């Protein structure tokens, strides 16, 4: 079976893939940024629509193929992808980096999250999660999981993982063993391509998961218990100043604790934006 990767092929290769899939009745339209109206345009009135207000812009590492972003104390935890270039590190909002750790050059790094004194870091197709010391990011061990790894976030008692499907997995924070799954739906329809994640506990105690959507500028707000998408943030107004490349898309969302603001960035983006999610003015 032909599978589509976590990055976009050059046009010449995509043409070959399209011909191959066309001959067997396949469809790659779900991977295209021009595949049709955004989820925000198709959602019903039951799903809250929000936009983005940019509060501040900070310098960011334009070489980082960002796969994970999270606020940890006074720093940001960043995990990156691409074979031979995947790493995890801490950085300040002024782009002062520390504790950089590479992974096996044959592996493609994915999302990461800190839970307690431990950081977990995913790989894309190797089924390996790295367990790291939260202070130094030194490797403490590994754990195995089935399928692909895309995004990670955590609450105090559970790690949440996406794998590109319409499911979120709930994992043990100590062993990474799977506890359960929930199907994610948008107005009753399966919502897939869930990518980088951020876990936020709302003012009412509700557990929310914010998810980038692969190759989209939409961000889903998901009720972690029911799996229902309760809000869609249209982040298309956030400036993408990355080099021209179809892979350099929005990816990376991190709530700033004690505030109504988030950090957002993208793959190989030179900027980190501090934003609020707001109701549209019109």
Q: Which residues fall in each region the model found?
A:
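Surface loop/turn motifs at the tips and blade-to-blade linkers of beta-strand repeat domains
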Residues: 57-62, 101-105, 141-147, 182-192, ...
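Short loop/turn segments that connect beta-strands within beta-propeller blades
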Residues: 91-96, 133-137, 172-176, 223-228, ...
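Beta-strand-rich domains and repeat architectures in extracellular enzymes and scaffolds
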Residues: 55-87, 101-113, 150, 266-270
């Amino acid at each position: 079976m032909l599978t589509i990767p976590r990055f976009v092929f050059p046009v010449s290769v995509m043409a070959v893939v399209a011909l191959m899939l066309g001959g067997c009745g396949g469809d790659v339209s779900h991977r295209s940024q021009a595949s049709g109206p955004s989820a925000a345009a198709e959602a019903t009135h039951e799903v809250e629509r929000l936009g983005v207000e940019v509060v501040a812009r900070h310098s960011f590492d334009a070489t980082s193929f960002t796969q994970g972003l999270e606020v940890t104390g006074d720093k940001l935890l960043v995990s990156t992808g691409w074979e031979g270039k995947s790493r995890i590190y801490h950085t300040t909002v002024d782009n002062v980096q520390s504790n950089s750790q590479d992974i096996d050059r044959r592996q493609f790094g994915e999302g990461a999250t800190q839970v307690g004194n431990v950081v977990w870091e995913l790989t894309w197709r190797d089924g390996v999660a790295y367990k790291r010391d939260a202070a130094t990011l030194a490797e403490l061990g590994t754990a195995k999981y089935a399928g692909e790894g895309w995004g990670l976030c955590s609450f105090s008692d559970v790690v949440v993982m996406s794998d590109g499907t319409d499911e979120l997995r709930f994992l043990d924070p100590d062993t990474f063993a799977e506890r359960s799954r929930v199907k994610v739906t948008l107005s009753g329809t399966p919502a897939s391509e869930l990518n980088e994640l951020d876990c936020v506990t709302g003012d009412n105690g509700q557990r929310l998961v914010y998810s980038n959507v692969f190759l989209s500028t939409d961000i889903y707000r998901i009720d972690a218990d029911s799996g229902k998408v309760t809000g869609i943030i249209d982040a298309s107004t956030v400036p993408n100043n990355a080099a021209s490349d179809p892979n350099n898309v929005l990816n990376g969302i991190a709530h700033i604790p004690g505030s109504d603001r988030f950090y957002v960035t993208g793959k190989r983006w030179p900027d980190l934006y501090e934003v609020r999610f707001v109701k549209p003015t019109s």
